[in-house]
């Protein structure tokens, strides 16, 4: 996977340490964690990254043991930090300056609501319509939490000088996220010292529907929606142009950076199978 790209993302990177197995025909309650040799697997990923000059990002969201993050940090694997989840102890959004450097930061992902969808509670409405809430009272609690989080986000933008008090008051009363606030959110996150920032087109275009809704199969059109603009139309789209200029000022390309020389050597595909075989 590293052969022709500059970066790879390891989904559920905790699987390098353990994976929850459920035997066929059994329930999740009957499953168990199967553990792997974390240091040995990281010791395979790291040299391959150097050899192919490919950055590695580990998707370390959810319940992740500290030892996994420590091992990945020692190997130079970037953490995966999302604005929605990065909070202070009291629930406020973590300021950009407090984000870690060895990480990729983003507002959201394909498995979470888009910025516009999060703002209007589109994800909560959808989960309610598909009966995905195990407890009916959970919807009410999450609606209350979401209302508080919208205010927390606006106040975070105001503290960074990206919105003034009048703009905060106006945005707080709007059901639909305006383009000015969308740009402010991305510029706020761009101030983080994190090495990489990722931007979703769905967030820039303020689309309410997320690409994938976990917990569904044929109940929801996962991975089947197209963006409303062609690449040519996107190039002249005002919101995208303004955001690109703003991000370019905050996170400019490194001066003097030269194109990476990709690895030209032929790498045999079964190498790692041999390395992990006890008789090798």
What are these regions (language model features)?
Residues 1-270, 278-280:
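Catalytic cores of glycan-processing enzymes that make or break glycosidic bonds
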